[in-house]
Amino acid sequence: MEELVINHQRVPVTVRRSARARRLRLQIESDKPELVLVIPRYALSMQIDSFIRKQTPWIEKHWNQALKKAAKRPKRNQKDGDTYFYFGETLTLKLIPSLSWKPGIRVDGNNLEITLHQATSLSDGKKAIKKTVQGFYKKKAEEVIHDRLQFFNEHYGLKYNRVTFRNQKTRWGSCSSAKNLNFNWRLIMAPIEIIDYVVVHELCHLKHMNHSADFWKLVAETIPNHKELRKWMKDNHYLLSYT
């Protein structure tokens, strides 16, 4: 880990040397946040220094944006009062002592209630909370997305094979050439219209494995406001983190 100082601001930098990279590249990892500098294997120090100087305005602008987003992201310590997103709504974590060693979880109004054995230690409790919420999110995402796939495919009548769910850093859905669909279970934190958009987006890739005009025309048959929803994802995706 290194750092840059730009306009009296310390910017942490992770340097990644890549045999496949053809040029110097910068990106902001908003989850941390940090600046990532990708360097081709044979790049010279003078080339790197010159590149960073030229990119200073870009770094300053996007770093400040990343800091603002990080400040809005919920801070979770796996304790009472933490906030979680569920279908775009904010739920407050409420811990309830129990005599059962098996944690329980349910949504009650604006609360996300988790029951833990009353003798659970602080460290074990934090691990149990994180695991329980993750399992809850994944289970609900599978239920909802399977249901929405079936609903929208009544219109499209397309054939797909396997449907899988993962926790991916930046990808919300994908469609393979083998007609397998993959979805990020963190979508369960987004409003239902966003979930629907991602579901339809991947369904339409079964017919058009590109983002051509025909692809977007197919999406618009059921999601006419897809541009608005894409913008929401671009502006708010960082809120759908689970750490």
Predicted regions and their residues:
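Active-site-proximal or metal-binding-adjacent scaffold patches in catalytic folds
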Residues: 1-197, 206-243
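Walker B catalytic acidic pair
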Residues: 202
